Amino acid sequence: MQDHKITLFHANWSFCSQMVRVALFELNIKFDERHIKLCDQYAEGENLDKNFLDINPLATVPVIKINNEVIVNSTTIIEELNKRFQSNLCIEEDDSVKSFVKQTTITEGDKFASTIGTIIPVFSAPLIEFMIRKLPLKSIIKIIMKHPRKDRKMIFLSMYFFGVAKKFPNLAIKKFADELIKFEKLLNEDNTYFYNEFSHIDINMMCVFNRLEDLKLSEVITTNKTPLLQRYWKNLQKRDSYKKGILNYYTSKEHKVIKDFYNDAPSPFLKPILVELAKRN
């Protein structure tokens, strides 16, 4: 019986929010939720409001409250949920497992586009810029005045005024091809998931693959270079948590943004990635 009050502060389309929601559904944890309209997607910019900054002064999601305790960072949240609810979701987390978990999420302080997890935001940057440039000026002023992080403030302002993100993905194409091949070689054809049992790494990779779908890049895991990745993704899509924690949180807004941005065309970065993959052994 669950005797903790769990409240999740999250955003529908947030990469790391998706990870935590999947974990909550995998662990069968009941939770209240509060959707935060992020400043890079919505005019309201609720993550910059005082009531949210009082909860997380960094203005990021996801945040979870367990009773009155606040926990931030998706990896930390999932690890804490795993410990407190006596699950084996993360398996025995030795150093190698922790390293893989770190590589498959957005980790503060990691080198730019250095892992598969930190490459995803680079590929997402043009889409984020598309949303930011549709915001009213008053929302940009709110970012200038209230965003607590100078780095994010400068990125958002550069996107809004100068459209700097259009070519960001070019910086990560070769490394991304390397990362895909690396993960292909790490997979075991006898396992259903990364290991045989579903784990924290699988949560992160589920979100990585789903974001590739959003970015019109999913074809990169359907080549003859990545047969195990393709099978792995199909297995992840069969989990109930994929629908409950990710697909069910898409609204007409997210679908419209994708449609308007790509205009039913493939990603301009798809072919360069496929070319790089073809070069790999």
Predicted regions and their residues:
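Long, positively charged, glycine-interspersed low-complexity recognition regions
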Residues: 215-281
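GST-like domain detector, emphasizing the conserved glutathione-binding G-site
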Residues: 1-147, 272-281
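Short alpha-helical hairpin
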Residues: 29-30, 35, 52, 148-159, ...
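Active-site-flanking alpha-helical
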Residues: 82, 208-209, 246
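GST-like fold's C-terminal all-alpha helical module
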Residues: 109-234
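Conserved G/P- and acidic residue-centered "switch" motifs that form tight phosphate/ATP-binding loops
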Residues: 14, 202, 239
